[in-house]
Every structure is written in structure tokens, then in C-alpha cells.
Amino acid sequence: MVQRCLVVALLVVVVAAALCSAQLNFTPNWGTGKRDAADFGDPYSFLYRLIQAEARKMSGCSN
């Protein structure tokens, strides 16, 4: 019984370690990165206009 509990506890520790493994690299020279936040504004505005147009179409059909 004790041996079974130890095996289960060891298995839980191994699975937890496998799920939590990660690598962290830090460098002071990261800079601004590869992406610019301004690039994401255009698709969102397009989707907003598309949703507005579809809502107008649907409100016209309800009459």
C-alpha cells in the first residue's frame, strides 16, 4: 500500500514537472520586437465596419 502511494506520488510529480517545464531567456537588447501594435488596428476597424453593415441589413429585413 505504501509502495503504491509512493509510485502514485512520483507519477504526479513527474507529470506536473512535464506540464510546467518552460524556458525563459532574457536579454536587455530585446528592442521593440518584430510586430508593431499599429498593425492590428486596421483589421479590427474592418471587422467593426463589417458588423455594422450586416446589422443595418438585418434591421432592414425585420420590417
Swiss-Prot record:
Residues 1-22 form the signal peptide. Its main location: secreted. Keywords: Amidation, Cleavage on pair of basic residues, Disulfide bond, Flight, Hormone, Neuropeptide, Pyrrolidone carboxylic acid, Secreted, Signal. Coiled coil: none annotated. The modification Pyrrolidone carboxylic acid is found at residue 23. PROSITE patterns: AKH. This hormone, released from cells in the corpora cardiaca, causes release of diglycerides from the fat body and stimulation of muscles to use these diglycerides as an energy source during energy-demanding processes. Adipokinetic hormone precursor-related peptide (APRP) can form three type of disulfide-bond dimers: p1 (alpha-alpha), p2 (alpha-beta), and p3 (beta-beta). This is Adipokinetic prohormone type 1. It comes from Schistocerca gregaria (Desert locust). The lineage of its organism: Eukaryota, Metazoa, Ecdysozoa, Arthropoda, Hexapoda.
